[in-house]
Swiss-Prot record:
Gene3D superfamilies: Hexapeptide repeat proteins. Its main location: cytoplasm. This is Dynactin subunit 6. It is found in: Cytoplasm, Cytoskeleton. CDD domains: LbH_Dynactin_6. Belongs to the dynactin subunits 5/6 family. Dynactin subunit 6 subfamily. Coiled coil: none annotated. One of its GO terms (biological process) is mitotic spindle organization. It comes from Dictyostelium discoideum. Part of the dynactin complex that activates the molecular motor dynein for ultra-processive transport along microtubules.
């Protein structure tokens, strides 16, 4: 997994979420204490980033898009590290060990515990990635009518990377027009 710039852990017992300036967190999203979110990330309304009792922090890199009803949950005592430029689409459920950069998680996919998703992967709508799995760079997992298939290709990443920054810019302009933005402790970068 490539190393994505991410905020430093200030304290495993910090009392509030830490958000680097220029991230956008909607008021009706849920963010646990101990979560760190880097610059540019957008949390849509009704998204949740939850640290269970006794679990480690969740550290989220730059420029991620976390859409409605997404649940990112850490139940492990180890930190959950999420890289940069990822797209988590509506209703996806993430309970993994780590995620690299430039990945797409389509609606209602599930990533189960201890899973490692490396860089530029695409997890299809409704797919379930089993516990303890490692998805190497450019892995594609898709659901057919009767089964789940896995292959590798750069095509999904090429498409995702070509529109991701434009998508982020649009969200940073439009979301504050229609939603209240959460006031959180801000670290200037």
């Amino acid at each position: 997994m490539s190393t994505a710039p991410s905020p430093t852990i200030t304290s495993p017992t910090q009392t509030s979420p830490v958000v680097i300036n220029k991230s956008l967190i909607c008021q009706d999203s849920t963010v646990s204490n101990g979560v760190q979110i880097a610059i540019g990330t957008v949390l849509h309304p009704r998204s949740s980033i939850i640290i269970s009792e006794g679990a480690g922090p969740i550290i989220i890199g730059e420029n991620n898009i976390i859409e409605e009803l997404v649940q990112i949950v850490n139940k492990s005592p180890e930190p959950m590290i999420i890289g940069s430029n990822n797209l988590f689409e509506v209703g996806s459920y993430i309970e993994c060990k780590s995620i690299g950069n430039g990945n797409v998680f389509e609606p209602k996919c599930k990533i189960l515990k201890n899973t490692i998703i490396k860089d530029q992967c695409s997890i299809g709508a409704g797919c379930i990635v089993s516990e303890d799995k490692i998805c190497e760079n450019n892995t594609i997992i898709a659901q057919t009518q009767n089964s789940q298939i896995q292959t590798t290709s750069t095509l999904p990443y090429d498409h995702h990377s070509s529109i991701h920054m434009t998508h982020l810019e649009l969200l940073h302009k439009s979301i504050p027009l229609f939603h209240t933005i959460k006031k959180t402790p801000i670290l200037e970068k």
